[in-house]
Structure formats: C-alpha cells, structure tokens
Amino acid sequence: MPQLQEAGELTGTKDKDYNIIWFTEQCLSNVLRLETYAADAEREGDTELAEFFRRAQETSRKGADQGKELLGSRLAG
C-alpha cells in the first residue's frame, strides 16, 4: 500500500500548523512526565537527578510557551 502524503487536505490543517500543535503538545506532556521523574528521584533522595529533571522540565515548559505564542499569532492572523 502506498504511503499517503498528508499536506492538510484530509485534516484541514496544514503540516506546518499541525507541527506547531504537535510540538507544543509534546512539550506539555514532557512537563508532566518530568514532574513524575523528579518526584521519583526526590523520593529516593537523589537530589542531583531531581534537579536534572527539573531543568529539563523548565526547558520543555519554555518550548511549550514559545509554541503556544507562535500558534496563537498564526491563528489570529
């Protein structure tokens, strides 16, 4: 079966817009997942690992914020 190339015809969402939505959702999911990982590390007394996950969580949060901002400006325009 040939691979279908979706460019927005089926979903009504252009790839570039879908990609922003996907990226933002993944960043938000990472923020939640990393909260669990940091809590696990803290429960085990591993402060270094907990801090590592908190830094990664902040990076994901920034990515989500940037994605939301970009998506918002594109939807408004």
Across the structure, where does each feature detected by a protein language model lie?
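Iron-associated oxidoreductase/ferritin-like identity signal
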Residues: 1-77
